């Protein structure tokens, strides 16, 4: 926030705002790059891509649009098709390519961890990443970003879509586990998601919580402003589920797309050819 104040910049609400801020900040001697974001080949880059698609108004598959920034998560009556030939897909890819001009030289090696570490070292003025990694600067007094960071939903490509996705982990039981072990496993799963454990995770660095009672704990709120900001985003309906719709073949789709879109972003392959390849690759996992 200190660098934004230095240049009298408003927090970017749209991708155009973001590019403007990057252009202003690119000459600042205090930082190496205006922004850092995950762009490593495979899952990190593909995730950045499909989240940008969401900011341009489309999920990566053809969920039914309801209105505003809402898509129907019920796919039982839908013949699923990939959305990588949509206008949103083209716009998202072009935006990410523009963003490379304001990003670290080693951007193509940045997964989520490297991205936030770069920001926490004061090398970039902004970062696009998950809140769970904010401990690298929120709880680190040696970080130049300590107590100098503001939080926003991801910037909008289309006006209604200044939104960010829900992250998290899925806990399950393997189908081949011995039946007598299931009660023990279930007991541990319940412990892992209990308010007591969630608070423990937060106190040891995971600055996110799916449990309202924990988020509203004064001790938790005092750790970082991030909880108030995420709570505000949720109340404003800017936290969405559909951007990373959890299909069984999601990981396969994302890994393939992340390799293909890399060729456009970093190797200058033709965009239409790249997106046709993404569409074909994703569709084979949907058939």
List the model feature ranges, each with a label.
Residues 164-165, 210-214, 228-286:
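C-terminal capping/gating helix-and-loop segments adjacent to ligand/active sites or protein-protein/ligand interfaces
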Residues 125-130:
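Paired acidic/hydrophobic, glycine-rich loop segments that form the ligand-binding mouth/hinge
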Residues 27-39, 194-205, 284-287:
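Bilobed periplasmic-binding protein-like "clamshell/Venus-flytrap" ligand-binding domains
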Residues 6-7, 80, 101-102, 139-209, ...:
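Extracytoplasmic/periplasmic substrate-recognition and gating elements
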């Amino acid at each position: 926030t200190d660098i934004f104040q230095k240049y009298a910049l408003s927090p970017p609400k749209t991708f155009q705002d973001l590019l403007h801020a990057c252009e202003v900040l690119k000459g600042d001697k205090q930082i190496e790059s205006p922004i850092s974001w995950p762009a490593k080949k495979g899952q990190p880059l593909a995730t950045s891509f499909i989240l940008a698609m969401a900011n341009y108004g489309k999920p990566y598959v053809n969920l039914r649009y309801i209105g505003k920034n809402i898509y129907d998560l019920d796919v039982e009556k839908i013949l699923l098709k990939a959305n990588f030939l949509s206008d949103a897909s083209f716009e998202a890819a072009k935006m990410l390519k523009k963003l490379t001009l304001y990003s670290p030289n080693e951007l193509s090696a940045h997964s989520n961890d490297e991205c936030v570490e770069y920001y926490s070292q004061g090398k970039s003025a902004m970062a696009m990443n998950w809140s769970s990694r904010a401990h690298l600067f929120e709880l680190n007094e040696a970080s130049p970003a300590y107590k100098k960071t503001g939080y926003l939903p991801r910037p909008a490509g289309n006006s209604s879509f200044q939104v960010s996705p829900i992250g998290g982990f899925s806990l399950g039981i393997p189908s081949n586990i011995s039946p007598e072990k299931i009660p023990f496993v279930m007991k541990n799963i319940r412990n892992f998601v209990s308010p007591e454990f969630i608070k423990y995770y937060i106190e040891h660095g995971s600055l996110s919580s799916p449990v309202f009672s924990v988020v509203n704990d004064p001790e938790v709120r005092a750790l970082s402003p991030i909880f108030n900001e995420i709570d505000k985003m949720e109340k404003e309906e800017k936290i969405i589920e559909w951007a990373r719709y959890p299909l069984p073949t999601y990981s396969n789709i994302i890994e393939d797309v992340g390799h293909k879109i890399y060729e456009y972003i970093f190797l200058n392959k033709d965009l239409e050819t790249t997106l046709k390849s993404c569409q074909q690759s994703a569709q084979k996992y949907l058939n």
